[in-house]
Curated annotation (Swiss-Prot):
<feature type="disulfide bond">
    <location>
        <begin position="149"/>
        <end position="166"/>
    </location>
</feature>
<feature type="signal peptide">
    <location>
        <begin position="1"/>
        <end position="19"/>
    </location>
</feature>
<dbReference type="GO" id="GO:0007155">
    <property type="term" value="P:cell adhesion"/>
</dbReference>
<dbReference type="GO" id="GO:0007342">
    <property type="term" value="P:fusion of sperm to egg plasma membrane involved in single fertilization"/>
</dbReference>
<dbReference type="GO" id="GO:0009897">
    <property type="term" value="C:external side of plasma membrane"/>
</dbReference>
<keyword id="KW-0675">Receptor</keyword>
<feature type="disulfide bond">
    <location>
        <begin position="79"/>
        <end position="172"/>
    </location>
</feature>
<dbReference type="GO" id="GO:0038023">
    <property type="term" value="F:signaling receptor activity"/>
</dbReference>
<comment type="function">
    <text>Receptor for IZUMO1 present at the cell surface of oocytes (oolemma), which is essential for species-specific gamete recognition and fertilization. The IZUMO1:IZUMO1R/JUNO interaction is a necessary adhesion event between sperm and egg that is required for fertilization but is not sufficient for cell fusion. The ligand-receptor interaction probably does not act as a membrane 'fusogen'. Does not bind folate.</text>
</comment>
<feature type="lipid moiety-binding region" description="GPI-anchor amidated serine">
    <location>
        <position position="228"/>
    </location>
</feature>
<keyword id="KW-1003">Cell membrane</keyword>
<feature type="region of interest" description="Important for interaction with IZUMO1">
    <location>
        <begin position="62"/>
        <end position="81"/>
    </location>
</feature>
<protein>
    <recommendedName>
        <fullName>Sperm-egg fusion protein Juno</fullName>
    </recommendedName>
</protein>
<comment type="subunit">
    <text>Monomer. Interacts with IZUMO1; the interaction is direct. IZUMO1 and IZUMO1R/JUNO form a complex with 1:1 stoichiometry. Interacts with FCRL3/MAIA; FCRL3/MAIA replaces IZUMO1R/JUNO as IZUMO1 receptor after sperm-egg adhesion, thereby permitting species-specific gamete fusion. Interacts with WDR54.</text>
</comment>
<dbReference type="GO" id="GO:0031528">
    <property type="term" value="C:microvillus membrane"/>
</dbReference>
<feature type="disulfide bond">
    <location>
        <begin position="47"/>
        <end position="95"/>
    </location>
</feature>
<keyword id="KW-0966">Cell projection</keyword>
Length: 250
């Protein structure tokens, strides 16, 4: 029996590393994502930061920039044109969602979150991705004078004409009415896909929805940090059971 204990101790040591690696450099199972990330030399505009390693294709990056995106037949202009800076933030957020291979620690099956049918062929989504404080603040500041009619854009639209329209009785009002704070905008727009982090950029503890390509992807290290704190409970349980039965094998 004694010869087994060093092996078990070694497994306990490497287990968090194994679990963490499973959450790194992956694409979610969703309608437009590639199966695995890979270089995409010709990504479009706001999606360019992910060209070295992307979960999106050139086509997806192009469609993310259209006023009525074919990705989900969703129009950002349901209450008229957005201010240019506001529109840019939303396109960056779409590129981040579609292209980033660094969202593994926050990926969850859609069915586990209360939806009986996965929307738009989507099997997975992200939940509570911690966006840096500046990302939420700048997004809110640049959008607060644009107009919308809902705080949760993930559902509840009128799709009778093939694209999203404001539901009956919903008023088009400034973003600041539906999103009183930067955290409200980050967290409510897509039903808690993002979370407003109190951490700032370069802290190593929050993700940036956009970054300068020449400076490298700061989200790689952040994803590794969060992945290392999310061990695989399935593997942990297996090792625990084995350790309990070892005395009977002597």
């Amino acid at each position: 029996m004694a010869c087994w204990w060093p092996l078990l101790l070694e497994l306990w040591t490497v287990m968090p590393t194994w679990a963490g690696d499973e959450l790194l450099n992956i694409c979610m199972n969703a309608k437009h994502h590639k199966r695995v990330p890979s270089p995409e030399d010709k990504l479009y505009e706001e999606c360019i930061p992910w060209k070295d390693n992307a979960c999106c294709t050139l086509t997806t990056s192009w469609e993310a920039h259209l006023d009525v995106s074919p990705l989900y037949n969703f129009s950002l202009f349901h209450c008229g044109l957005l201010m240019p800076g506001c529109r840019k933030h939303f396109i960056q957020a779409i590129c981040f969602y579609e292209c980033s291979p660094n969202l593994g620690p926050w990926i969850q099956p859609v069915g586990s979150l209360g939806w009986e049918v996965a929307p738009s062929g989507q099997g997975e989504r992200v939940v509570n991705v911690p966006l840096c404080q500046e990302d939420c603040e700048e997004w809110w500041e640049d959008c607060r004078m644009s107009y919308t009619c809902k705080s949760n854009w993930r559902g509840g639209w009128d799709w009778s004409q093939g694209k999203n329209r404001c539901p009956k009785g919903a008023q088009c009002l400034p973003f600041s009415h539906y999103f009183p704070t930067p955290a409200d905008l980050c967290e409510k727009t897509w039903s808690n896909s993002f979370k407003a982090s109190p951490e700032r950029r370069n802290s190593g503890r929050c993700l940036q929805k956009w970054f300068e390509p020449a400076q490298g992807n700061p989200n790689v290290a952040v994803a590794r940090l969060f992945a290392s704190s999310a061990p695989s409970w399935e593997l942990s349980y297996t090792i625990m059971v084995c350790s309990l039965f070892l005395p009977f094998l002597s």
